[in-house]
Amino acid sequence: MGKLTRFGLAAVVAGTMTMGAAFAQDGKTVKIGWAPWSDAEFVTKLARKLIEDNLGQKVELVQTDVAPLYQGVSRGDIDAMMMAWLPETHADYYKRVEGKVENLGPLYEGAKLGWIVPDYIPESEISSIEDLKKPEVREKLKGEIQGIDPGAGLTRLSQEAIKKYGLDYKLNISSEAAMLTTVDRANRSEGWFVATSWSPHWMFGKYKLRYIADPKGALGGAEHIDAVARKGFKEDNPKVAALLAKMSIPINELEAAMFDAQETSYEKAVDKYIADHPDRIKEWLSQ
């Protein structure tokens, strides 16, 4: 449980429990949607823990794909989501619902999308997307780029990048789990691969990977990940909305917490993060 003892953590939480009792009048179960991405899972489960333990409300987590998430929040079927990648990755989704949702602000900044290769591939062979055109490189990669799920903004941008660079490659659209399997298997035998990826992600703490250059900017620039809620959420759940608006995590801390979650569990990683950052948690919960 980190440097704090169980007693110490209890004291931190107890300090906010009086607020939790006062906030109980909001009362309703809060529905928070998320897609099965590592960063989204951690911040969503962190929010659930803080809401249930300190604000006196139950939280129902709704797991689905990205498009249904935006639709659900815009219709009011889902109260909030904590994984709006802006300004580029989720631009198409966000434009469709912008007038029907409330943006509560960024949860973390400095995120990025890109294509990765393992460090054991020499940079003289692959340092840029342009290098994928080399016949010998394409042969070693079998003309394939390992992708993630079909609804992801990264998938759309990767499809556009293949066209912009004139690559004779197939994008294997699947899931984050399939991408991670490719990365893991290749690293065991030092096999060649290129995969679509993003930061923050725990795998950068486990494997030696690097992004390759994108000179045409096809995959976008720096991103911020925002919490987005349905219209009227701030009025119906002012305390929860205030918490989500205050939550802000440095990206290096988030990646470390995500790695902890892979080594233990998301629940244990959430508990550890709360124990290790009592002052920040107290600030988030202050009204």
Regions found by a protein language model. Name each.
Residues A22-I32, K134-K142, R280-Q287:
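Immediate post-signal peptide segment of exported/extracytoplasmic ligand-binding proteins
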Residues G99-G147:
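A conserved helix-loop-strand patch within extracytoplasmic ligand-binding domains
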Residues M82-V97, R185-R210:
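A ligand-binding cleft/hinge motif common to bilobed small-molecule-binding domains
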Residues L113-E123, E223-D236:
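A bilobed periplasmic-binding-protein/Venus flytrap-type ligand-binding module shared by bacterial periplasmic
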